[in-house]
Amino acid sequence: MNPVKNQVPKVGFVSLGCPKALVDSERILTQLRVEGYDIVPSYDAADVVVVNTCGFIDSAVTESLDAIGEAMNANGKVIVTGCLGKRPEQIREAYPQVLAVSGPQDYQSVMEAVHAALPPRHDPFVDLVPDYGIKLTPRHYAYLKISEGCNHRCSFCIIPSMRGDLVSRPVDEVLCEAERLVRGGVKELLVVSQDTSAYGVDLKYAERPWRDRMYQTRMKALCEGLSELGVWTRLHYVYPYPHVDDVLPLMAEGKLLPYLDIPFQHASPRILKLMKRPGAVEKTLQRVQRWKAMCPEITVRSTFIVGFPGETDAEFESLLDFLDQAQLDRVGAFAYSPVDGASANALPDPVPEEVKQERLARFMAKQAEISALRLEAKIGSVQQCLVDLIEDDIAVARSRADAPEIDGLVHIQNGGELGLKVGDLVDVEITDSDEHDLFGDALPANVVPQQGRALNLQMV
């Protein structure tokens, strides 16, 4: 597998896990390209393979170990990084021949391991790498990671043990990166972190200069800066703190997408206390209602856990009641499963697996009814949409209410007829709906074509 002298060194790359891990992969890939490495889409063509792992839940650990094994069998020279890398003994027990193991966002260790296995070229490709770096997303949207780590200690979560406490990026650094992405053709910025609403608390909200004015390293100020770029900006992983209200005027004024991704997790005060989560359910409902009053177009997405240890029938019913009262637009849920290292594992009264699955099915059926009615109410409206895909004569897009991969789609029936392209912004008249998606026809006079180009690499 050793490269011939003067041949371009080739690296295979596998990226697993959440959008935050995807950003880590993009940063590593950017550095590899800057140093002259080719990124190849197969194990056979690679001189070495980097696997960026996930370790959040047991199924993710299994997927990561399987990916390492596949790379070992097909290539034999494997470098492991990412969240599962915080458990090197588990990786080396399964695969003692891996070349190196490092934890998340440890970019230097990854590069050192690559250098040791495969020295870089003397004539790197600096001029061939866009100033916004290598992106693994389609060219019209990008994840913008604003911080690492988390100060919360939720009992079901082990992220702080893997990624550490909150470390915010300076606001000017984030805004400059966003500006580079927009210059490269990105039309949607997806702000991600472990806790977006806590952004800047570790830096004591320090002020930094950008575009001839000072900005605090704080969520609201960051959003104000991003709104200057003239693209869609979507907030993910927001905690339901009171100061979230501060960004609602930006949404109401059209400067920020009217969208909040807030993981409520449950509606029982006792269960929330066991989870070590904020537990004032009445205040949460009041806050959701206030957001809708301040910005009637707002979309609220959330995630929940059913079958948490000790969850009673009555507490599960209270969760269903919460859905009825909150009328959330988008909801994700999963049945609780123990995570190695989580303090919730020690809680008494585990819920039987069959009960968890029955509750999950009821929960999702309840939310499907709510989502279907909320989508049906959009029939006859005009929604601005961003085209993600062209399939035959139909353009598959997302409205301002839909984040990529986790929310619904808008199927534009006359997309082919109008010659729509991926990355186009278009107004769509909604003609039909189901419990997940919308259907409609584009208004031809209101198409903003995609411009610019970002280098898009496919993951192995």
UniProtKB/Swiss-Prot annotation:
Domain (Radical SAM core): give its ranges: 136-374
- What InterPro entries does this protein's entry cite? Elp3/MiaA/NifB-like_rSAM, Methylthiotransferase, Methylthiotransferase_CS, Methylthiotransferase_N, Methylthiotransferase_N_sf, NA-bd_OB-fold, Ribosomal_uS12_MeSTrfase_RimO, rSAM
The UniProt annotation places [4Fe-4S] cluster 1 binding at C18, C54, C83
Name the enzyme group at the top EC level. transferase
Sequence positions that bind [4Fe-4S] cluster 2: C150, C154, C157
This protein's cofactor list reads: [4Fe-4S] cluster
- What SUPFAM superfamilies has UniProt attached to this entry? Radical SAM enzymes
Keywords, in A-Z order: 4Fe-4S, Cytoplasm, Iron, Iron-sulfur, Metal-binding, S-adenosyl-L-methionine, Transferase
Q: Show the NCBIfam families listed in the entry.
A: 30S ribosomal protein S12 methylthiotransferase RimO, MiaB/RimO family radical SAM methylthiotransferase
* General function of this protein: Catalyzes the methylthiolation of an aspartic acid residue of ribosomal protein uS12.
What's the name of the protein? Ribosomal protein uS12 methylthiotransferase RimO
Native source species: Xanthomonas oryzae pv. oryzae (strain PXO99A)
